[in-house]
Protein backbone atom coordinates (compact mmCIF):
# COMPACT_ATOMS: atom_id res chain seq x y z
CA UNK A 1 0.00 0.00 0.00
CA UNK A 2 1.45 3.38 -1.03
CA UNK A 3 1.72 6.47 1.14
CA UNK A 4 -1.51 8.50 1.34
CA UNK A 5 -1.41 11.72 -0.69
CA UNK A 6 -5.08 12.73 -0.62
CA UNK A 7 -6.96 15.37 1.41
CA UNK A 8 -5.63 15.48 4.98
CA UNK A 9 -8.81 16.86 6.55
CA UNK A 10 -10.71 13.80 5.38
CA UNK A 11 -8.29 11.63 7.34
CA UNK A 12 -8.38 13.59 10.59
CA UNK A 13 -12.17 13.83 10.51
CA UNK A 14 -12.19 10.05 10.51
CA UNK A 15 -9.21 9.34 12.77
CA UNK A 16 -9.24 12.48 14.95
CA UNK A 17 -6.42 15.01 15.18
CA UNK A 18 -3.00 13.86 13.99
CA UNK A 19 -0.33 16.49 14.77
CA UNK A 20 2.26 14.99 12.43
CA UNK A 21 -0.09 15.06 9.43
CA UNK A 22 -1.56 18.54 9.80
CA UNK A 23 -1.68 21.31 12.38
CA UNK A 24 -5.33 22.00 11.63
CA UNK A 25 -7.84 20.91 14.24
CA UNK A 26 -11.25 19.62 13.23
CA UNK A 27 -14.14 17.98 15.01
CA UNK A 28 -14.22 14.28 14.26
CA UNK A 29 -17.26 12.66 12.69
CA UNK A 30 -17.76 10.68 15.89
CA UNK A 31 -18.46 13.88 17.81
CA UNK A 32 -20.98 15.11 15.23
CA UNK A 33 -23.42 12.23 15.56
CA UNK A 34 -26.86 13.60 16.45
CA UNK A 35 -29.02 12.21 19.22
CA UNK A 36 -31.33 10.45 16.77
CA UNK A 37 -28.38 8.76 15.08
CA UNK A 38 -26.71 7.53 18.26
CA UNK A 39 -29.25 4.78 18.75
CA UNK A 40 -28.52 3.26 15.35
CA UNK A 41 -24.74 3.45 15.55
CA UNK A 42 -23.10 0.09 15.09
CA UNK A 43 -20.96 -1.21 17.89
CA UNK A 44 -17.31 -1.09 16.86
CA UNK A 45 -15.61 -4.48 16.95
CA UNK A 46 -12.28 -5.10 18.65
CA UNK A 47 -10.77 -5.50 15.20
CA UNK A 48 -12.17 -2.10 14.22
CA UNK A 49 -10.65 -0.47 17.31
CA UNK A 50 -7.24 -1.98 16.57
CA UNK A 51 -7.48 -1.05 12.90
CA UNK A 52 -8.23 2.57 13.79
CA UNK A 53 -5.23 2.72 16.15
CA UNK A 54 -3.01 1.31 13.42
CA UNK A 55 -4.32 3.82 10.89
CA UNK A 56 -3.76 6.71 13.31
CA UNK A 57 -0.15 5.66 13.76
CA UNK A 58 0.44 5.13 10.04
CA UNK A 59 -1.07 8.41 8.89
CA UNK A 60 0.47 10.51 11.65
CA UNK A 61 4.00 9.40 10.77
CA UNK A 62 3.33 9.23 7.02
CA UNK A 63 4.17 5.56 6.55
CA UNK A 64 3.15 2.97 4.01
CA UNK A 65 1.59 -0.24 5.29
CA UNK A 66 4.77 -2.15 4.48
CA UNK A 67 6.96 0.37 6.32
CA UNK A 68 4.86 0.17 9.47
CA UNK A 69 4.83 -3.63 9.36
CA UNK A 70 8.62 -3.64 9.08
CA UNK A 71 8.90 -1.37 12.11
CA UNK A 72 6.63 -3.70 14.09
CA UNK A 73 8.84 -6.65 13.15
CA UNK A 74 11.96 -4.80 14.28
CA UNK A 75 10.28 -3.85 17.56
CA UNK A 76 9.27 -7.47 18.18
CA UNK A 77 12.89 -8.60 17.86
CA UNK A 78 14.18 -6.01 20.33
CA UNK A 79 14.28 -6.37 24.10
CA UNK A 80 11.57 -4.54 26.02
CA UNK A 81 7.98 -3.49 25.40
CA UNK A 82 7.18 -3.99 21.70
CA UNK A 83 4.72 -1.09 21.65
CA UNK A 84 7.06 1.39 23.29
CA UNK A 85 9.99 0.36 21.12
CA UNK A 86 7.76 0.79 18.05
CA UNK A 87 6.90 4.35 19.07
CA UNK A 88 10.54 5.06 19.82
CA UNK A 89 11.59 3.88 16.35
CA UNK A 90 9.03 6.15 14.70
CA UNK A 91 9.82 9.16 16.88
CA UNK A 92 13.55 8.92 16.19
CA UNK A 93 13.10 9.13 12.41
CA UNK A 94 14.76 12.22 10.97
CA UNK A 95 11.52 13.58 9.48
CA UNK A 96 9.82 13.38 12.87
CA UNK A 97 12.82 14.88 14.69
CA UNK A 98 12.63 17.95 12.42
CA UNK A 99 8.93 18.22 13.19
CA UNK A 100 9.40 17.90 16.96
CA UNK A 101 12.20 20.50 16.93
CA UNK A 102 9.82 22.97 15.29
CA UNK A 103 11.76 23.34 12.04
CA UNK A 104 8.59 22.50 10.09
CA UNK A 105 4.83 22.48 10.84
CA UNK A 106 4.22 18.87 9.75
CA UNK A 107 6.06 15.64 9.01
CA UNK A 108 5.27 15.83 5.25
CA UNK A 109 6.96 19.26 5.24
CA UNK A 110 10.01 17.73 6.91
CA UNK A 111 10.11 14.94 4.36
CA UNK A 112 10.17 17.50 1.55
CA UNK A 113 13.16 19.33 3.06
CA UNK A 114 15.03 16.06 3.49
CA UNK A 115 14.28 14.83 -0.02
CA UNK A 116 15.58 18.13 -1.42
CA UNK A 117 18.87 17.57 0.42
CA UNK A 118 18.54 20.60 2.69
CA UNK A 119 19.16 18.74 5.96
CA UNK A 120 22.50 17.82 7.48
CA UNK A 121 23.14 15.36 10.29
CA UNK A 122 26.58 15.75 11.84
CA UNK A 123 27.56 17.98 8.88
CA UNK A 124 26.61 15.36 6.30
CA UNK A 125 23.66 15.65 3.93
CA UNK A 126 20.96 13.10 4.67
CA UNK A 127 18.21 12.68 2.07
CA UNK A 128 16.43 9.71 3.63
CA UNK A 129 13.40 10.69 5.78
CA UNK A 130 13.51 7.37 7.65
CA UNK A 131 17.10 7.97 8.81
CA UNK A 132 17.31 6.85 12.45
CA UNK A 133 18.68 9.61 14.68
CA UNK A 134 20.84 8.70 17.66
CA UNK A 135 21.96 10.45 20.85
CA UNK A 136 24.58 13.17 20.20
CA UNK A 137 23.40 13.70 16.60
CA UNK A 138 23.37 17.35 15.48
CA UNK A 139 20.78 18.43 12.90
CA UNK A 140 21.31 21.59 10.85
CA UNK A 141 19.99 23.29 7.70
CA UNK A 142 22.02 22.96 4.52
CA UNK A 143 22.23 26.63 3.55
CA UNK A 144 21.31 30.07 4.97
CA UNK A 145 19.12 30.76 1.92
CA UNK A 146 17.04 27.70 2.64
CA UNK A 147 16.62 28.79 6.22
CA UNK A 148 15.69 32.35 5.30
CA UNK A 149 13.09 31.41 2.72
CA UNK A 150 11.43 28.50 4.48
CA UNK A 151 12.13 28.45 8.18
CA UNK A 152 12.68 31.96 9.57
CA UNK A 153 9.12 32.69 10.67
CA UNK A 154 8.52 29.12 11.76
CA UNK A 155 11.55 28.91 14.06
CA UNK A 156 11.06 32.37 15.58
CA UNK A 157 7.41 31.71 16.40
CA UNK A 158 8.05 28.24 17.79
CA UNK A 159 8.31 28.25 21.59
CA UNK A 160 11.39 26.42 22.82
CA UNK A 161 9.37 24.96 25.69
CA UNK A 162 7.44 22.97 23.08
CA UNK A 163 10.55 20.95 22.27
CA UNK A 164 10.51 17.58 24.08
CA UNK A 165 13.21 16.87 26.65
CA UNK A 166 15.12 14.38 24.51
CA UNK A 167 15.85 17.17 22.02
CA UNK A 168 17.40 20.63 22.27
CA UNK A 169 16.81 23.54 19.89
CA UNK A 170 19.64 26.07 19.72
CA UNK A 171 19.14 29.53 18.21
CA UNK A 172 22.39 30.99 19.53
CA UNK A 173 23.78 31.62 16.04
CA UNK A 174 21.72 34.00 13.86
CA UNK A 175 19.99 32.18 11.01
CA UNK A 176 21.73 28.92 11.90
CA UNK A 177 19.36 26.86 14.03
CA UNK A 178 20.67 23.58 15.41
CA UNK A 179 18.88 20.58 16.79
CA UNK A 180 20.55 18.24 19.26
CA UNK A 181 19.46 14.71 20.12
CA UNK A 182 20.10 14.29 23.84
CA UNK A 183 18.89 10.73 24.31
CA UNK A 184 16.34 8.22 23.02
CA UNK A 185 12.80 9.39 23.58
CA UNK A 186 10.77 7.97 26.47
CA UNK A 187 7.06 7.12 26.44
CA UNK A 188 6.00 10.32 28.22
CA UNK A 189 7.39 12.50 25.42
CA UNK A 190 5.59 10.80 22.52
CA UNK A 191 3.77 13.44 20.50
CA UNK A 192 0.77 11.34 19.45
CA UNK A 193 -1.98 10.25 21.83
CA UNK A 194 -2.38 6.57 21.08
CA UNK A 195 -2.65 3.15 22.69
CA UNK A 196 0.29 1.42 21.04
CA UNK A 197 -0.77 -1.99 22.41
CA UNK A 198 -3.74 -1.94 20.04
CA UNK A 199 -1.34 -1.58 17.11
CA UNK A 200 0.79 -4.48 18.34
CA UNK A 201 -2.34 -6.61 18.74
CA UNK A 202 -3.47 -5.71 15.21
CA UNK A 203 -0.20 -7.05 13.80
CA UNK A 204 -0.01 -10.05 16.14
CA UNK A 205 -0.72 -12.48 13.30
CA UNK A 206 1.18 -10.60 10.62
CA UNK A 207 4.49 -9.63 12.20
Curated annotation (Swiss-Prot):
Residues 92-150 form the S4 RNA-binding domain. It comes from the Eukaryota. GO terms for biological process: ribosomal small subunit biogenesis; translation. One of its GO terms (cellular component) is small ribosomal subunit. It holds the Pfam family S4. Keywords: Chloroplast, Plastid, Ribonucleoprotein, Ribosomal protein, RNA-binding, rRNA-binding. The keyword Chloroplast applies. CDD domains: S4. It is found in: Plastid, Chloroplast. GO terms for molecular function: rRNA binding; structural constituent of ribosome. The keyword Cell inner membrane does not apply. Belongs to the universal ribosomal protein uS4 family. One of the primary rRNA binding proteins, it binds directly to 16S rRNA where it nucleates assembly of the body of the 30S subunit. Part of the 30S ribosomal subunit. Contacts protein S5. The interaction surface between S4 and S5 is involved in control of translational fidelity. This is Small ribosomal subunit protein uS4c. It comes from Equisetum variegatum (Variegated horsetail). The lineage of its organism: Eukaryota, Viridiplantae, Streptophyta, Embryophyta, Tracheophyta. The gene is rps4.
Amino acid sequence: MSRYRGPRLRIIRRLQNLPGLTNKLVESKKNKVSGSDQSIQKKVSQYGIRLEAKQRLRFNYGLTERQLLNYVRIARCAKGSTGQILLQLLEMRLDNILFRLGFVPTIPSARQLINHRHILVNNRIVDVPSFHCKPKDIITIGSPKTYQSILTKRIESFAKDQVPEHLTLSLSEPKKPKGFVNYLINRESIGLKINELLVVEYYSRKA
